[in-house]
């Protein structure tokens, strides 16, 4: 009986530790430093949260999370049931997002515990730009594991064809076609993607902009911070 209880206790402890490891593979702190309210959004985990100036939202991302996005929504109005709309980044008219936001929106993207035990992460302007952003490991380890940012005045300098209320849209949404959307094989930069790249060289400016825009950190030992208006 004693042996069985010891086995069960050890099994429970192992299960508990495995569960904690799974649940807290990475902590992502989202902070709003903008002088206005930002309605932060996060998929596939997190949903959404109103962040007034100086407020922070902590997201616990499980191991293996991928195709994940964090972005900010602006000029939103929601009722008590969490339904409404946003000028930029709207995700189907709900506070707690389950799908991606409507462009333009500056994106922090990540995938945890992928190839070679690495986290992959980036800032993307493929969906356009609405809010300045930094995305950084809280414990950088050198190499490709360091802070990146996109803080240029893109909204103020946005080319006329891409200008929309509250942001600077992306050429795929604006014009469509393989040249801008890269949906049918290889593609290269355009004058519009170069506009974004010149101002935010660490960020994706078009879908195949991987060499200068994708960053990695060791899985399981790295936490992250996203800051709006750093």
Curated annotation (Swiss-Prot):
Task: Please provide the record's keywords in A-Z order.
Answer: Disulfide bond, Glycosidase, Hydrolase, Pathogenesis-related protein, Plant defense, Secreted, Signal, Vacuole
Cysteine disulfide links: 34-229, 76-86, 91-97, 145-217, 150-200, 158-168, 172-181, 182-187
What biological-process terms (Gene Ontology) are attached? defense response; response to fungus
Q: Which Gene3D superfamilies match?
A: Thaumatin
Concerning what turns on (or off) its expression, the entry says:
Accumulates in the xylem sap in the presence of Fusarium oxysporum f. sp. lycopersici.
**This protein's GO CC annotations:** apoplast; vacuole
State the compartments where it is located.
Secreted; Vacuole
**One GO MF term attached to the UniProt entry:** beta-glucanase activity
Q: What is its main location?
A: secreted
Does Glycoprotein count among this protein's keywords?
Answer: no
Under the heading InterPro entries, the entry gives: Osmotin/thaumatin-like_sf, Thaumatin, Thaumatin_CS
Coiled coil regions in record: none
- This one is known as Osmotin-like protein PR-5x
Q: Tell me which species this is from.
A: Solanum lycopersicum (Tomato)
